[in-house]
Every structure is written in C-alpha cells, then in structure tokens.
C-alpha cells in the first residue's frame, strides 16, 4: 500500500498535464530556468565592475614602492610582482562567485570552464605607466557569452574612472552614459595608437605614421590599449588602432566601444602574409585576433575611412 500511494503522487502531476492543467512547478526552478540573457549580463557587469574597482584601488596603494621588474617578450615589455598579485586577487574573486566560468589572464593564469562564459583579464594594462606612476594604467575585465563579447569593465585608479558596459546597460563612465565621437571626417580625427614591444616592429610602425599623420588631426599614444579603447567609447579620441594585441588587451574595451555605438574591426594579413589585400572583419570575439592582427576601433561612420587609411599606408609587419 505505501508503494501504491508513492506511485500515485508521482503520476498525479502527469495526469494534470494530460488533462490540460499545469502542475505548480517550483517557482525558484522556473526563475532560474527563465533567467534572461539581459539579467545574466547585468549580473556579470556588476561583478566585473566591482572586481576592477576593488582591485584597482588596492593596486594604486602600491604606487611608489620598489618593485621587482622583469620582462617578457622584450626589455620594454615590463611585468611586476603587482601584476601577478593583482591577477591572483581577481581570479580568486571571480572563482569564489562563479566557479564554473573559464578564465584567461595576461600573466598566465588559466582556469578551464564548464559553461559558455569566459573571462579575459588584464590585471594591469599599461604596466610601464604603473611603474612610472603615470595615470594611463588600468584594470581590464572582459566577459564573453557564447563566444561573443558582452560585458566589460575598465578602472583607471589614478583618474578614479570606472567604465562599464553591457548590451542592456550601454556604456557608462562613473555611472554617466557615454558614446563614441560623432566625427565623420578623417581629417578631423584624433587617433590613438600603441607601439609594439618588439624592436623589429617599432621601426615599421614609425614609418607607417609618416603616411598616416598628414591625413588626420593628430596621433595620441597613451600606453595602454584598454584605456585607449575606453577613450574611444567616451569620445575622447575618435579612433584607435594597434598591431599585435592579445585578447585580454581588448576584451573589456571591445564591450565598451560597441555598447557606446562604435565598432571594432580586425585587419589580418592575406594568406601570403602581407597586408596588400588583407582580410577585414567585424570583431565579435576578442579570441578572433592573432599575433599579426591590427585591431581598429571607432564610430561606425568613421571606421571604413580608418581601415582604408591603414591599408593604404603600406603597413607591413612581415
């Protein structure tokens, strides 16, 4: 008899469904199941913003200390023990709240994920600026969902500026909504760029500027790709380009730019290895850039002019 009662209770909800009635399903389960992508993005944006600002304030307190300097790809590619400390702080903070997400960091930390969410983290973007107490360094935290950039947060501690973005939230700086520049003429464009850490590319980049400078308003070199992209997103510069970036350099900035009404594109060399007939694509994921890619960001009405300028400037990093 107890078994028959047990079976009846299990079959009864099914009978209700078959009779056209809906069982009262656990409401918590329904809410979890029906969580919209916007809600997920907002949760991730809030978390990324908190992480960037919390870590950035701690990093700023270490300014002026004697740091252990090492180099990576070249003597100009600096890393300090604070970069590594910041990376550890951020990854521990993320994993404590989102243990199933994938995490990829500049200084080598990699945590394999179990879902469709991936974090790209630059613990200090613009380390040389940090070493010199120059304000152009930042903490950069980007998030992809289903291999598409969705969320970003960049915090510049010495300027106390927190940029954050998601598709449902737009892009803000310290809570104020921002958007890309309305400049639509290349000759009026202020363009930011960065230089390679590799000496063999720096000469080429200097030569490229000879063909670029006469056709634009001016060039700015601030020393950190993340903050450069934040500057595009809020209209402080009209465009940005740089060769040889990595996913963690641009992930957060990508979210800022596209949710501020801008666009990011990637110029890849042709199969023969040159840029005379390059492949030019709209960037969907920061994973789509490679060692020889040129990343370009601006407003949608200026992007084609910037890309054409770069191609016509005889760029060659082979």
Regions found by a protein language model. Give the residues of each.
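Serine residues within intrinsically disordered or low-complexity segments
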Residues: 4-6, 27
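N-terminal subdomain of lithium-sensitive/metallo-dependent phosphomonoesterases centered on the IMPase/IPPase/PAP
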Residues: 20-21, 25-124, 307-318
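Residue-level signal for inorganic ion chemistry
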Residues: 59, 83, 94, 127, ...
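A short, compositionally biased
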Residues: 65, 137, 165-169, 258, ...
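DPxDG-like acidic metal-binding loop motif
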Residues: 113-172, 187
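An extended, acidic
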Residues: 179-318
């Amino acid at each position: 008899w107890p078994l028959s009662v047990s079976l009846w209770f299990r079959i009864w909800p099914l009978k209700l469904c078959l009779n056209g009635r809906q069982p009262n399903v656990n409401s918590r389960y329904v809410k979890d199941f029906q969580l919209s992508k916007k809600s997920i993005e907002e949760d991730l944006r809030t978390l990324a913003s908190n992480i960037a600002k919390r870590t950035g304030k701690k990093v700023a307190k270490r300014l002026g200390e004697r740091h252990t300097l090492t180099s990576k790809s070249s003597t100009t590619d600096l890393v300090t023990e604070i970069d590594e400390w910041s990376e550890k702080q951020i990854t521990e903070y993320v994993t404590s709240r989102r243990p199933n997400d994938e995490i990829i960091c500049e200084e080598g930390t990699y945590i394999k994920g179990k879902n469709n969410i991936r974090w790209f983290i630059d613990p200090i973007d613009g380390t040389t600026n940090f070493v010199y107490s120059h304000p152009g360094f930042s903490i950069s935290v980007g998030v992809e969902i289903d291999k598409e950039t969705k969320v970003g947060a960049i915090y510049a501690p010495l300027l106390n500026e927190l940029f954050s973005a998601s598709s449902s939230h737009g892009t803000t700086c310290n809570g104020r909504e921002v958007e890309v520049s309305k400049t639509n003429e290349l000759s009026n464009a202020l363009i930011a760029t960065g230089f390679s850490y590799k000496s063999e590319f720096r000469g080429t980049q200097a030569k490229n500027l000879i063909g670029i400078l006469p056709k634009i308003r001016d060039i700015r070199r601030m020393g950190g790709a993340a903050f450069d992209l934040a500057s595009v997103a809020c209209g402080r510069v009209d465009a940005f380009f740089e060769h040889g970036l990595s996913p963690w350099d641009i992930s957060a900035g990508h979210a800022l730019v596209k949710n501020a009404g801008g666009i990011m594109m990637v110029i890849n060399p042709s199969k023969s290895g040159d840029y005379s007939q390059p492949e030019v694509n709209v960037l969907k994921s920061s994973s789509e850039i490679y060692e020889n890619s040129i990343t370009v960001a601006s407003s949608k009405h200026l992007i084609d002019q910037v890309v054409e300028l770069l191609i016509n400037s005889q760029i060659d990093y082979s």
